[in-house]
């Protein structure tokens, strides 16, 4: 039954007041903020009359952080203190970012985190991103004329748990309430109003300044469901700029550059790339030398990167279990899709024209604003339901170093899934829970997310305890895990907040390896399972002999001990067939002993009772 809101005559219920909600596209190169006004999603304008805020932060000596266009002016004169493309550093470890080419910043290692050594002080990627978000928040509050209820912030669909958590942390630091983290391709689909069109399958090709995402979505009966996602959070417009940078350095025979010179070449290269979208050549002066590149040469260089995006696109189509012909629309998102070659090659893959009628820089922010307006309660969500998916499988370590998958890759989120486990040894009073991410069968081949212990399990016979472990992934793609011993009610839980995450090169490798080593992994898993069963049987026999050895005559005891020794010697070998043979031999040898113990237990239970009582 619906609840009615009752208020005094003349009073307006707060529940019906319009709440100020915004959508934020926190981009690698540029960031935007949008809001729904008079039923239309509009990108808000900053003080300089621009809708785009460059994702650039200058860290000055006076502890002042300058954001946007004003910060960008410092890039040539003070490159080590001017942080550009900070999104690439979100959720990354020091080891991972140390491989970035031509990085002008002084980076410090702080545990698993990375710090930028600047004139302002040592700052994390989260703190720098927070200053960008704070600037967007200030712009929104000024434009909308009031305090914000909250924001929907977009992230690449292929952002992992660490990168998503880092984004939420940055929002909190900026004083923003995160209503939801929304995948960028999903936001684009909302902006294009696909939910108001015919039912069908759509592809969202999102090539931004530093990230690439491809999402295959279906729309049916009011539900937007992400069928599959793929991408690379370290591939974007910056990499196309780098092609020109490298060609310039090679062509002009430059051996060494100062950080200031490198930053100038990067800016010139970006301008040259944009020029080549409409002209046959571009040129600029570099260290008193003239550099020239033709459109034809740039496209030859760029094809390699575009082909990488198309391989990921094909994989997403395969994962979605649809054919190219089934896809109705291909939406182009991100500033890098302005390159004519990108549009041509994507159109050629799908054999149909691509959609790019909405400004590719603004489409994500507009979609996020529409979703924020719904989540703020300003508009019914009855029109459309958004369902995203998980990029990698989540599971637990079991005996023998095996991984038991709890939630599989490309499962729709939010989701709660539980699985029951038990104890391995008699009298076991604690269990270590090891949460993993990946597609392989063994712990050593997957990524560790967290470990925690469930203490206070009542001591009982091995296999008697019932421990339910529950995985919960929220709408933001963040994971929490709980463990409950069903008999005693003992419970513990953890929210996974990793200090750094996987690069998409690592993600790609994990997925490729899961296919490449699928047969070997299954064989290895079967071997490990047999080894675990052998050790479990040996422990059970040892315990039985300790209690009831007196039941056996010398011959039976010697036969059991001989069979046990054979299995013990084979238990750690790589010969699964031999282990199974030895295991079967021990079980057959012990069958009479098992029967004797069972009869003895029954006789003890019946002492002093009649059969009729049972």
Swiss-Prot record:
Pfam families: HSP70 (PF00012). GO terms for molecular function: ATP binding; ATP hydrolysis activity; ATP-dependent protein folding chaperone; unfolded protein binding. Signal peptide: none annotated. GO terms for biological process: iron-sulfur cluster assembly. InterPro entries: ATPase_NBD, Heat_shock_70_CS, HscA_NBD, HSP70_C_sf, HSP70_peptide-bd_sf, Hsp_70_fam, ISC_FeS_clus_asmbl_HscA. SUPFAM superfamilies: Actin-like ATPase domain (SSF53067), Heat shock protein 70kD (HSP70), C-terminal subdomain (SSF100934), Heat shock protein 70kD (HSP70), peptide-binding domain (SSF100920). Keywords: ATP-binding, Chaperone, Nucleotide-binding. Chaperone involved in the maturation of iron-sulfur cluster-containing proteins. Has a low intrinsic ATPase activity which is markedly stimulated by HscB. HAMAP family: HscA. Belongs to the heat shock protein 70 family. PANTHER family: HEAT SHOCK PROTEIN 70KDA (PTHR19375). This is Chaperone protein HscA homolog. The gene is hscA.
């Amino acid at each position: 039954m619906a609840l009615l809101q009752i208020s005094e005559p003349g009073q307006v219920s707060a529940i019906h007041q319009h709440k100020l909600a915004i959508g934020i596209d926190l981009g690698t190169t540029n960031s935007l903020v949008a809001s729904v006004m008079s039923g239309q999603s509009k990108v808000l304008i900053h003080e300089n009359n621009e809708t785009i805020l460059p994702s650039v932060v200058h860290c000055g000596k006076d502890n002042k952080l300058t954001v946007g266009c004003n910060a960008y002016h410092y890039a040539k004169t003070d490159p080590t203190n001017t942080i550009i493309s900070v999104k690439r550093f979100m959720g990354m470890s020091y080891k991972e970012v140390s491989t970035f080419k031509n990085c002008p910043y002084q980076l410090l290692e702080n545990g698993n985190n990375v710090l930028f050594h600047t004139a302002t002080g040592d700052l994390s990627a989260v703190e720098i991103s927070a200053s960008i978000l704070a600037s967007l928040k200030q712009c929104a509050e000024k434009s909308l004329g009031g305090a914000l209820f909250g924001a929907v912030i977009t992230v690449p669909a292929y952002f992992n748990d660490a990168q998503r958590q880092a984004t939420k942390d940055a929002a909190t630091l900026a004083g923003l309430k995160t209503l939801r983290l929304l995948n960028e391709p999903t936001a684009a689909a909302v902006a294009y109003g696909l939910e108001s069109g015919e039912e069908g399958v759509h592809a969202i090709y999102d090539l931004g300044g530093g990230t690439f995402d491809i999402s295959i979505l279906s729309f049916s009966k009011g539900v937007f469901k992400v069928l599959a996602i793929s991408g690379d959070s370290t591939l974007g417009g910056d990499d196309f700029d780098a092609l020109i940078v490298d060609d310039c350095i090679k062509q002009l025979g430059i051996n060494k550059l100062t950080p200031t010179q490198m930053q100038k070449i990067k800016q010139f290269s970006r301008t040259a790339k944009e020029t080549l979208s409409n002209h046959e050549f571009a040129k600029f002066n570099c260290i008193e030398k003239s550099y020239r590149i033709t459109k034809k040469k740039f496209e030859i260089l760029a094809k390699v990167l575009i082909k990488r995006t198309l391989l990921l696109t094909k994989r997403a189509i395969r994962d979605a279990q649809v054919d190219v012909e089934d896809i109705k629309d291909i939406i182009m998102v991100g500033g890098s899709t302005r390159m004519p070659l990108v549009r041509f090659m994507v159109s050629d893959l799908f054999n149909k024209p691509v959609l790019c009628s909405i400004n590719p820089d603004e489409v994500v922010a507009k979609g996020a604003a529409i979703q924020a307006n719904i989540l703020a309660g300003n508009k019914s969500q009855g029109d459309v339901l958004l369902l995203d998916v998980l990029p990698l499988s989540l599971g637990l370590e079991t005996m023998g170093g095996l991984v038991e998958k709890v939630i599989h890759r490309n499962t729709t989120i939010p989701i709660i899934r539980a699985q029951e486990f038990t104890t391995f040894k008699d009298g076991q009073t604690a269990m270590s829970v090891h949460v993993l991410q990946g597609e392989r069968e063994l712990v050593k081949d997957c990524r560790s997310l967290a470990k925690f212990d469930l203490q206070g399990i009542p001591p009982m016979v091995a296999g008697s305890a019932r421990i339910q472990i529950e995985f919960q992934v929220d709408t933001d793609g963040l994971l929490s895990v709980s463990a409950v011993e069903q008999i005693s009610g003992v419970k513990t839980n953890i929210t996974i907040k990793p200090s750094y995450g996987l690069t998409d090169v690592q993600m790609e490798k994990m997925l490729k390896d899961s296919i490449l080593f699928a047969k070997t992994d299954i064989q290895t898993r079967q071997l490990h399972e047999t080894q675990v069963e052998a050790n479990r049987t040996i422990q059970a026999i040892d315990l039985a002999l300790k209690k009831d050895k007196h039941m056996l005559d010398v011959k039976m005891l010697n036969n059991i001990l001989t069979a046990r020794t054979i299995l013990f010697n084979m238990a750690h070998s790589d010969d699964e067939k031999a282990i199974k043979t030895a295991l079967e031999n021990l079980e057959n040898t012990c069958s009479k002993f098992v029967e004797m113990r069972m009869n003895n237990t029954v006789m003890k239970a019946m002492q002093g009772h009649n059969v009729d009582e049972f």
